[in-house]
């Protein structure tokens, strides 16, 4: 009813308003239609159908034919609707620009909000352009403008205000903007505040001055302080009173008596009025001002008729709504009473139901009435839709006519002059006409009436909206009533059903008795069957027990011969034969054809996979897993037997419960029988009148009896199937389970019997093994690896040559891919864990994967060693050589291992003499006849040798250790990679070992394990020498004897991955799907699990040590990100962590770590659509697919250990998967030690250990950095400090204030350097690399002995040291001498405090790559000085624009930035535009194209005009060009003095890619577009020569070029993307100069200026005063943490430089006196992907820096003779040649800049004097 009444009230006014709108649309008035619910109605003017006027092309219609309101005249004379977005009804003829924009809008089409307003003006409704809420929309708006950012409104405040919403006063002002009527006023401290501040310092709310200087006091520092007198405001001469400490007059200085009080009416003297009185006086003054302001505000409130009418309307509406609400409440109470009465008795229930049915009919009639009104509304809406369709058709007709009559054609000069004469005549005719005063008056009157009608309609519209808000409430109440009625009806039906069921049960009792008797008989029979089954089960259980004992015997036999499984030589032969897959043809093809490198890379990838499929390693691993399989079989048999036993026990329990159930059913049967007898007696005693009824009841009872019998039989069946009540079923199950246990036992016996037989056969066959098979395998492996070793260096040399020729071309990616595949091939060879037998004459040269730089300070090598069986006649082992790692000359710089005098001896040489460390505690002759672990280690000059002797029968191990130390100064093993060899077991005949290692070759078996953190193998060899297969049978090794290999774990080296195909073969996706895995890693980032299916994916990865889950199963809302936001579980601590991923009910993802819930996430219900899973990584083609790269930028493979991968609790052996790559067995402890740490300038690590740094201390570490300053190490004990730091590239050691510094000052070169510091009572020494510096007698006396204490020391920085900045770079291989521990390398993972430090990744840094641009705008040749400065020779290649995408290893992702520094872009495509002369210039092109040329290019644009291609001679007489005009392609060149012009018919500015070929052959031209349209023209040939001279301009031309030949609109730069420029089939890629060209980015763009990673800068068009006073403000969104932002430089050396450094903003200024600077480190990182505002203010010698809400300032020296200079300003970068020696070259800025303002004036980069490099002016990739 409310709906119908509301429509009846609103409909007449709405019809009246529609009629008014129709009059407004058809008449000559200025009214524009009213907007309903945001829709914008635009009138139309339909010309008469009888006579349609035709206007000639280019003529205007007579002035009398003026268009109606809302339309304008086009050049063709038609009336076209104004496009003002509903915010105006007037626009200018000809252009269509809107005037008189309303609703706070502006712009050519009223599409923008006015300054100070915010909203969506396109919606065309007044509520969408609202005043800026800064802080309040209307009453307190103190912003110039505002904008939205991340859903919040950000304000650009007036000068006096600050804060995101201008909610507080700026520094130097006071007030409370949040208080209505309050404003921010300037602080008035009478000039007595701190002069070093830019502004006066006062309380930001009250305005009371702080820190009054010059002996003043008071609220505004307006009077002299107590004890002083004088003029504090003007003269500022407050002097000390001469009253002997007594009071004096504050003005005259006259001494006053103690307790003096001034006369009434005078101000209180200073001595008697305390601060509280003055504060109270000031507060009262402020209160009075606030009262006056509030009074004026109240008086200004409008109390006119309109306000009263509005209030009355609101009151009337409220009263009406209250009345209707009370009516609804009364009805609701009535309904409630009726429902309560219905629940009391059944009779009242039936009457109430009838009453409710009647009321329901009434409600139905009302609903039909509402439905009828709704149908009327729908019909009315349909009429409106039809009118809208008619309007759309008319608009389309007008548009077609406009296109037909408005098509532009090129006019000859004669036609243009004729048109101008005609236009002048028309203008004169217009001027001669009389003005339209009368019409204007009529229009104004009608406009006033329309506005009045509009206001009335708006008030009715508000009433209508308020009424509509009541509809949901009313409808909700109706729904509640209907629901209650439905519930009541259901309750009645249920009650009736219960009555009928009761009657049925009473009639069926007789039949139940008979059925229960039969049931009891059946139960007795089942009991007999149960007893028989129990006896059978007891007999069956004896068989599994016997089987288990037999299996135990088999296991013992298998474990006894398990050590010989590794010697399965027949399987070894197959694996070794697969290693020769690399052919010479592949290498030659890669050298000859660089363009086919990708295809060869794919081929190598396939061969790489095939080298590990079904070969030696896999079969050897299969053999090593036999024991594990046997254990699994036995375990499964035990579980099956236990399950059978439990089932039998449950059967006993079920049988014991049968008796109870039988008794219960018997009692029930008796009760039913009694009830039946009672009913029968009642039936016999009934009267004859009830006989008929009784007969009917009996018939029904019989029918129900048969139905009940059926139901009872079903119940009996269910009873038999019950878990506790059915003995037969449980016994059957027990019988089946027992039989299954027997079958499993037999299968285990059948499976283990062949194994036992095979073990026996292998043991016998290995004694008589045919050496020919192994000879073939070893020779095949030797040839393959020899070929690989010879081919790979040649291939790498050739690839390096290609990369040097084109350092950043697209070939680099393919070259890098080949390198990666070669590394993976070597990685596979390194993981072959099989030993080699040496006979004393054989030798192996191993290929070391470890960097020689990593071996300088720290070297650790481990291997398995088994000496030969000792002959009885020998008492000790003969001297033997084991291994050598060092230089080829073998005179210095080496390490080795040998057996001397029956002792294992570790030898190392650091440049002068040998150090020998014999392990004399365990002679070699006493070693067991199986493998032992040997480990040699060196830290600096300290060396160790370890021996671990395992036990085959237990897990016990014997450990032996021996230490040694080099007595000289050297501490580095300085090896040259080109001059280093690694020999094992022996050496070739042409190599001469050093004297200490010149021994006979080793006899026995060796197997390499690790070198530093890398896994190595003898099978990754370069050469083998004298390896005789007949005597070199590898020895079997029982890995299970060693502690580190007892767990079935896998090692991922960061380059490989495991693949499990068809995981559903062992488990199914169900209601609960679960993945489990255990990981152990010190790394920060890595991929753990990945599943991919098209665009759908699931990914579990680690970022900064915390888990992230990304998944998309085809969700409509896109991918879901599950993140450990609370940081509950950090897993990169080198400990095992159990990770579980649970997917519940296809709609909830749960992350569990170490059995603790971390986080869960709900999603759209969707099943998991995957079958394959990648573990620890994935192939590059998977990681780099577009579907993953859009959401998953992290593509770092996992490095560390994994074990226990399970799907649905089913285990998978990762090494059994055929596609597993780069995964080894075991978990080497050395690979999990964090020996290195990376610091970012804001990080450090700390530990507390017992070390004495001031007494007998020695320590050392490696460091690598590009920064000249930084704190490397810090320790403090009270006032005594021990530190090592970098200062301008010099290493400085500071011990208790005494500094020792290195001689060399260039240690910030990005190379690794080793520092050793030693402190003794008489000398402090510092050694950097091999340079020693010392300070003797540091204390000039006896040094005080100090005890070692446990105090904290720091690496990489310190939170308590302010002298040095924190370190940026890598620190590794640190060690200390301790009292209680041996010298060993520090494991940073054990440190207690780690702040923003990466303990795994240590990126290799190098000097930044700068793009050298030429000075000036249009110079075509580079200057020699720039070549010298850049270090390039004359033949150095010019900048290649294709090289904008550098290889990933040279441009790593900034780990501290949220956004990638290289946004997604189309390969080899570049974006032009933004400036009028955006372009690339190409010079020195090969080949002559004077007679004939064929150019091709791809383009994409939405612009209608622009230059694409241009080349000419110097005078531009001969030229060739391709450009866009009106969206059409135009190809033009000259033939003599004539111009040949080919123009396309279609437009190609549709935003799609198009291929264009333009061909010139003397006087003929051809234009081919997309290979489909061929346009051809020709001119008569001439004998004139056609000569052009470069450069070729692409995307635009230099200023002043092409004006002679091309129309002005098409001279400016092409706006769009160009790609693949070719000349005669050859690509043109090397650009000599680039101006405002960036890669063609994909994805959304936003307004701003983008500076790409390739470097570039903008030179502003106006000079800038960098002298005494200025203010710069701008917003940035960086994609790197460092870079130049603004730079200005004068000729006399003064400069301003604003730049970022590791997230810190720094301002450096030189004012002619000296340098001074300030910096701000924001709390919120600048690299968080959001916009940040930076402001730099300078006033004389004071410079203030604002970064968001953080403020800092510096006061520099005053220049007595300052000079203002106006010099160019560089933004985003600066040429290196302009930097002074005091300014180190900085990286160019990478990211976006917008809203750049200088001294309050916005700066437009599109008007810049120069845009050089990769800079996009008007667009920026969105975050």
UniProtKB/Swiss-Prot annotation:
It is found in: Secreted, Extracellular space, Extracellular matrix, Basement membrane; Secreted. It comes from the Eukaryota. Residues 82-131, 132-186, 187-240, 241-255 form the Laminin EGF-like domain. Residues 833-1035, 1047-1227, 1234-1402, 1469-1640, 1647-1820 form the Laminin G-like domain. The keyword Secreted applies. Transmembrane segments: none annotated. Laminin is a complex glycoprotein, consisting of three different polypeptide chains (alpha, beta, gamma), which are bound to each other by disulfide bonds into a cross-shaped molecule comprising one long and three short arms with globules at each end. Alpha-4 is a subunit of laminin-8 (laminin-411), laminin-9 (laminin-421) and laminin-14 (laminin-423). The alpha-helical domains I and II are thought to interact with other laminin chains to form a coiled coil structure. Domain G is globular. It is linked to Cardiomyopathy, dilated, 1JJ: A disorder characterized by ventricular dilation and impaired systolic function, resulting in congestive heart failure and arrhythmia. Patients are at risk of premature death. This is Laminin subunit alpha-4. It comes from Homo sapiens. The lineage of its organism: Eukaryota, Metazoa, Chordata, Craniata, Vertebrata.
């Amino acid at each position: 009813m409310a709906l119908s009444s509301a429509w009846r009230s609103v409909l007449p006014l709405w019809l009246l308003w529609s009629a008014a709108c129709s009059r407004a649309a058809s008449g000559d008035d200025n009214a524009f239609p009213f907007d309903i619910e945001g829709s914008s109605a635009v009138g139309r003017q339909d010309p008469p159908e009888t006579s349609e006027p035709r206007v000639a092309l280019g003529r205007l219609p007579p002035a009398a034919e003026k268009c109606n309101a809302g339309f304008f005249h086009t050049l063709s004379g038609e009336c076209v609707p104004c496009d003002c977005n509903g915010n105006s009804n007037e626009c200018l003829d000809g252009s269509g620009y809107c005037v008189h924009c309303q609703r706070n809008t502006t712009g050519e089409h009223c599409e923008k909000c006015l300054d100070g307003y915010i909203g969506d003006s396109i919606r065309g409704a007044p509520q969408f352009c609202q005043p800026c809420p800064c802080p309040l929309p209307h009453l307190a708006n103190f912003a110039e403008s505002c904008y939205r950012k991340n859903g919040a409104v950000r304000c650009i405040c007036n000068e006096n205000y600050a804060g995101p919403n201008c909610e507080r006063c700026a520094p130097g002002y006071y007030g409370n903007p949040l208080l209505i009527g309050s404003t921010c006023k300037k602080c008035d401290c009478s000039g007595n505040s701190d002069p070093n501040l830019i502004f006066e310092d006062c309380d930001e709310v009250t305005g009371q001055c702080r820190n009054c200087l010059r002996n003043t006091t008071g609220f505004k520092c307006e009077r002299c302080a107590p004890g002083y007198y004088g003029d504090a405001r003007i003269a500022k001469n407050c002097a000390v009173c001469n009253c002997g400490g007594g009071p004096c007059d504050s003005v005259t200085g006259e001494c006053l008596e103690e307790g003096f009080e001034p006369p009434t009416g005078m101000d209180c003297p200073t001595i008697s009025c305390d601060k509280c009185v003055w504060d109270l006086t000031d507060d009262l003054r402020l209160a009075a001002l606030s009262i006056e302001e509030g009074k004026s505000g109240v008086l200004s409130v409008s109390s006119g008729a309109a306000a009263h009418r509005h209030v009355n309307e609101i009151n009337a509406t409220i009263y009406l709504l209250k009345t209707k609400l009370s009516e609804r409440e009364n009805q609701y109470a009535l309904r409630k009473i009726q429902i309560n009465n219905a629940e009391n008795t059944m009779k009242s229930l039936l009457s109430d139901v009838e009453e409710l049915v009647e009321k329901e009919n009434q409600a139905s009639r009302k609903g039909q009435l509402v439905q009828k009104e709704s149908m009327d509304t729908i019909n009315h809406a349909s009429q409106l839709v039809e009118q809208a369709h008619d309007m759309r058709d008319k608009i389309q007709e007008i548009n077609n006519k406009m296109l037909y009559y408005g098509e532009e054609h090129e006019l000859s000069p004669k036609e243009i002059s004729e048109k101008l004469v005609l236009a002048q005549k028309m203008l004169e005719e217009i001027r001669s006409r009389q003005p339209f005063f009368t019409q204007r008056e009529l229009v104004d009157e009608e406009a006033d009436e329309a506005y009045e009608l509009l206001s009335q309609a708006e008030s009715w519209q508000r009433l209508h909206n308020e009424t509509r808000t009541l509809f949901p409430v009313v409808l909700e109440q109706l729904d509640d009533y209907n629901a209650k009625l439905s519930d009541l009806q259901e309750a009645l039906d249920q009650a009736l059903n219960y009555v009928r069921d009761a009657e049925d049960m009473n009639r069926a009792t007789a039949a139940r008795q008979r059925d229960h008797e039969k049931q009891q008989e059946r139960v007795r029979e089942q009991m007999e069957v149960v007893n028989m089954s129990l006896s059978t089960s007891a007999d069956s259980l004896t068989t599994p027990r016997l089987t288990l004992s037999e299996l135990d015997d088999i296991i013992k036999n298998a474990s006894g011969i398990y050590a010989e499984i590794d010697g399965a030589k027949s399987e070894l032969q197959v694996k070794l034969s697969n290693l020769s897959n690399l052919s010479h043809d592949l290498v030659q093809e890669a050298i000859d054809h660089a363009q086919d490198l990708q295809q060869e890379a794919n081929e190598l990838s396939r061969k790489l996979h095939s080298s590990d499929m079904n070969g030696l390693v896999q079969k050897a691993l299969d053999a090593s897993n036999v024991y594990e399989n046997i254990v699994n079989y036995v375990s499964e048999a035990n579980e099956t037997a236990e399950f059978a036993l439990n089932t039998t026990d449950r059967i006993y329990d079920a049988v014991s419960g049968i008796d109870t159930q039988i008794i219960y059913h018997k009692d029930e049967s008796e009760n039913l029988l009694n009830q039946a007898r009672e009913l029968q007696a009642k039936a016999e005693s009934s009267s004859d009148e009830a006989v008929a009824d009784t007969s009917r009841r009996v018939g029904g009872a019989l029918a129900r009896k048969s139905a009940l019998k059926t139901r009872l039989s079903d119940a009996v069946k269910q009873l038999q199937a019950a878990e506790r009540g059915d003995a037969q079923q449980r016994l059957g199950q027990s019988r089946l389970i027992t039989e299954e246990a027997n079958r499993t036992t037999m299968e285990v016996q059948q499976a283990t019997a062949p194994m036992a037989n095979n073990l026996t056969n292998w043991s016998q066959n290995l004694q008589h093994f045919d050496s020919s098979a192994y000879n073939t395998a070893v020779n095949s492996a030797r040839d393959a690896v020899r070929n690989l070793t010879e081919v790979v260096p040649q291939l790498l040399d050739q690839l390096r040559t290609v990369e040097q020729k084109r350092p950043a071309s697209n070939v680099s990616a393919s070259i890098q891919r080949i390198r990666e595949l070669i590394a993976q091939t070597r990685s596979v060879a390194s993981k072959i864990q099989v030993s080699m037998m040496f006979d004393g004459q054989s030798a192996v040269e191993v290929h070391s994967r470890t960097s020689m730089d990593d071996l300088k300070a720290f070297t650790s090598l481990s291997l398995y060693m088994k000496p030969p069986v000792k002959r009885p006649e020998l008492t000790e082992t003969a001297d033997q050589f084991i291994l050598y790692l060092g230089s080829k000359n073998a005179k210095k710089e080496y390490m080795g291992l040998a057996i001397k005098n029956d002792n294992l001896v570790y030898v190392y040489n650091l440049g002068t003499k040998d150090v020998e460390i014999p392990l004399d505690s365990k002679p070699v002759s006493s070693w067991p006849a199986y493998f032992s672990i040997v480990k040699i280690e060196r830290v600096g000059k300290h060396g160790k040798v370890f021996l671990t002797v395992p036990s085959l029968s237990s897990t016990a191990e014997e450990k032996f250790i021996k230490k040694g130390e080099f007595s000289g100064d050297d501490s580095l093993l300085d090896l040259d990679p080109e001059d280093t060899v690694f020999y094992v077991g022996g050496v070739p005949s042409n190599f001469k070992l050093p004297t200490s290692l010149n021994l006979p070759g080793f006899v026995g078996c060796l197997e390499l394990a690790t070198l530093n953190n890398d896994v190595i193998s003898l099978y990754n060899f370069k050469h083998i020498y004298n390896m005789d297969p007949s005597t070199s049978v590898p020895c079997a090794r029982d890995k299970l004897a060693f502690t580190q290999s007892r767990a079935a774990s896998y090692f991922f080296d960061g380059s490989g991955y495991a693949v499990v195909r068809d995981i559903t073969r062992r488990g199914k996706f169900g209601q609960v799907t679960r993945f489990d895995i255990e990981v152990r890693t010190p790394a920060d980032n890595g991929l753990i699990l990945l599943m991919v299916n098209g665009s759908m994916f699931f990914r579990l990865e680690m970022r900064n040590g915390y888990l992230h889950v990304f998944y998309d199963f085809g969700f409509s809302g896109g991918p879901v990100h599950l993140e450990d936001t609370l940081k509950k579980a950090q897993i990169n601590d080198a400990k095992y962590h159990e990770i579980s991923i649970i997917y519940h009910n296809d709609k909830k993802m749960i992350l569990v770590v170490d059995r603790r819930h971390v986080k869960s996430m709900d999603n759209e219900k969707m099943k998991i659509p995957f079958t394959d899973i990648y573990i620890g990584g994935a192939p590059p083609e998977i990681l780099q697919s577009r579907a993953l790269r859009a959401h998953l930028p992290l593509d770092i493979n996992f490095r560390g250990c994994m074990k226990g991968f399970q799907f649905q609790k089913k285990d998978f052996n990762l090494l059994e998967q055929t596609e597993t790559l780069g995964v080894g067995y075991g978990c080497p402890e050395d690979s999990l030690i964090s020996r290195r740490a990376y610091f970012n300038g804001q990080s450090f690590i700390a530990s507390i250990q017992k070390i004495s740094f001031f007494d007998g201390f020695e320590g050392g570490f490696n460091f690598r950095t590009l920064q000249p300053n930084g704190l490397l190490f810090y320790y403090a004990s009270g006032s005594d400090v021990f530190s090592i730091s970098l200062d301008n590239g010099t290493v400085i050691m500071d011990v208790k204030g005494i500094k020792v510094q290195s001689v060399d000052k260039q240690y910030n070169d990005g190379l690794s350097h080793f520092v050793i510091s030693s402190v003794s009572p008489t000398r402090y020494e510092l050694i950097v690399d091999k340079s020693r510096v010392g300070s003797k007698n540091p204390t000039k006396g006896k040094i005080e002995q100090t005890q070692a204490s446990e105090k904290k020391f720091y690496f990489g920085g310190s939170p308590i040291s302010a002298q040095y900045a924190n370190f940026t770079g890598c620190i590794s291989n640190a060690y200390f001498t301790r009292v209680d521990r041996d010298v060993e390398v520090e494991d940073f993972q054990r440190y207690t405090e780690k702040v923003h430090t990466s303990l795994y990744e240590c990126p290799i840094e190098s000097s930044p790559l700068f793009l050298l641009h030429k000075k000036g705008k249009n110079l075509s040749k580079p200057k020699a000085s720039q070549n010298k400065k850049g270090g390039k020779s004359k033949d150095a290649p010019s900048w290649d624009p294709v090289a904008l995408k550098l290889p990933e290893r040279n441009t790593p992702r900034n780990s501290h930035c949220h956004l990638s520094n290289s946004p997604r872009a189309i390969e080899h495509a570049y974006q032009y535009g933004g400036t009028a002369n955006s372009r690339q210039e190409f010079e020195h092109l090969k080949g002559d194209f004077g007679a004939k040329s064929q150019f091709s290019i791809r383009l994409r644009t939405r612009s209608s005009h622009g230059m694409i291609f241009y080349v000419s001679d110097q005078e531009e007489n001969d030229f060739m060009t391709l450009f866009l005009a009106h969206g059409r392609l135009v190809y033009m060149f000259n033939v003599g003095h004539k111009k040949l012009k080919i123009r396309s018919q279609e437009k190609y500015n549709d935003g799609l890619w198009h291929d264009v070929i333009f061909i010139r052959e003397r006087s003929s031209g051809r234009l081919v577009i997309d290979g489909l349209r061929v346009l051809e023209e020709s001119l008569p040939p001439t004998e004139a020569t056609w000569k052009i001279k470069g450069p070729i301009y692409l995307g635009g031309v230099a200023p002043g070029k092409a004006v002679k030949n091309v129309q002005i609109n098409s001279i400016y730069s092409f706006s769009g993307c160009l790609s693949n420029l070719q000349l005669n089939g050859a690509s043109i890629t090397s650009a000599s100069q680039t101006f405002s060209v960036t890669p063609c980015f994909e994805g959304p763009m936003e307004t701003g200026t983008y500076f790409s990673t390739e470097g570039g800068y903008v030179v502003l068009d106006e000079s800038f005063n960098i002298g005494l006073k200025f203010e710069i403000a701008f917003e940035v969104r960086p994609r790197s943490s460092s870079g130049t932002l603004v730079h200005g430089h004068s000729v006399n050396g003064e400069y301003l430089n604003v730049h970022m450094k590791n997230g810190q903003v720094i301002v450096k200024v030189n004012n002619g006196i000296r340098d001074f600077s300030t910096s701000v480190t924001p709390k919120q990182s600048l690299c968080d992907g959001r916009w940040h505002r930076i402001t730099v203010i300078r006033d004389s010698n004071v410079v203030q820096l604002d970064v968001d809400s953080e403020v800092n300032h510096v006061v520099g020296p005053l220049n007595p003779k300052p000079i203002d200079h106006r010099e160019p300003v560089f933004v985003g970068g600066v040429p290196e040649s302009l930097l002074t020696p005091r300014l180190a070259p900085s990286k160019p800025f990478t990211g976006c800049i917008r809203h750049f303002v200088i001294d309050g004036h916005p700066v437009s980069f599109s008007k810049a004097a120069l845009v050089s490099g990769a800079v996009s002016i008007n667009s920026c990739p969105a975050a």
